[in-house]
Amino acid sequence: MLLKCSAEASASTITSSNTVFIHYYYSFYGRVSILKGIGNTRFVLTQTTVYHYSWCCLLRNYKRLCTYPVFNQLGGDNNIYLLFHKIGKGKLYFAIV
């Protein structure tokens, strides 16, 4: 079962430097999966509080992009903070799986 949340990367939600900041609260260990939204948008993960992560580029047609294991949170709470750089137009979707 997927618990999903989305953040729309539009002119109203991104900064002048084309970044998307996501704050997600989770209550269990899992993996954060980044999935493609709409169009040819590419998102690059630039900062996160999850211990294990990597750089990535988006795939097309809602295919799973990459998965970030969530072993623990920096700071000891249940908050995930992700910062993405956005290129193009579209939406960024992620899910706890």
UniProtKB/Swiss-Prot annotation:
It comes from the Eukaryota. This is Putative uncharacterized protein YDR220C.
